[in-house]
Amino acid sequence: MVSSDYFSTGDGHQLYWERHGTPGGEPIFFLHGGPGGCSDRRHLEFFDGRCFDIILFDQRGCGRSVPHGELQYNDTGRCVEDIEALRQHLGFGTISMLGVSWGSWLAIQYQQRYPEAVLKTTLVSVFVPFAANVSAYDQTLNGGLSATAHGAYAVSAGAIYQILNNGCATQQRQAALHWLRATLQLSGQSMQPSALEEFVDDEALRAIRLELHYHVNQYFFTTADEAPSLDAQTEVIQGISDTFGMASVRWLRRRQPLRCRLLNAGHNAFELAILKTVRQSLKREHLR
């Protein structure tokens, strides 16, 4: 690691950031998934550190940013402005971006607002929160919650969110466990009950609540977001088994031509097919 610090947004949030790779290399911002996720050293696997000046940072309320899980002044627009503020703070003229899952939408939004500041953009396991996609995702989530209810009374994402905001400590913990069991099952993953119980601490509760804060607000998608324009240096890397990612790609393609590499993979960007393709793509684009 070259350096790390906190950056004040000026409205109560402190964003944790780290700098890796080679100072003077091509500056690239990694935009993590979620909402409510975080950056991690494992994300460095996407990059050749000899070529890139890599910035990892935790979005508002995420990871090591503080206050953790804070909902006030936490929306898509402010997260996009944070990218620009960090770019200026770190002294970069232009930046490339690698956006994964939710981070891909932030990268698209940043490119709309600050096209002159963008060198290249790579979108991986894309998620675009247009109305039909969010509705389908919500139905899938609610179906998963119903299937794993086992007597629980919260069988919708909205109900889980209300409990996490207003329930007692016991209710919040049970709601979080229910949410995680459902989302793990939907993603084809599993955890031992004892491991799941241990995982659900106060930090996990706040992260789930933040994720649902975005979900119940339709990810703050507006009519102005209906017609994004991506530049020619934007590349999409997408697994074909990722239902909502493929819906997002089709939505983007209806609006403009798209450089897109479709892979026999799902949503997880650490699947070997996706990871290798991202590394190769970033290296190839860097050499241009």
Q: Which residue stretches match the model-derived regions?
A:
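Conserved alpha/beta-hydrolase
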Residues: G49-P67
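Conserved hydrolase catalytic core segment
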Residues: G93-S135
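Alpha/beta-hydrolase
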Residues: N142-E226
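Conserved acidic catalytic loop of the alpha/beta-hydrolase fold
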Residues: G77-I95
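Flexible "cap/lid" loop of the alpha/beta hydrolase fold
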Residues: T121-A157
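Catalytic histidine-centered segment of alpha/beta-hydrolase-like enzymes
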Residues: F244, L262-K276
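Short beta-strand/loop motif that positions the catalytic acidic residue
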Residues: L230, V236-Q238
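The serine-hydrolase catalytic nucleophile loop
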Residues: P35-D48
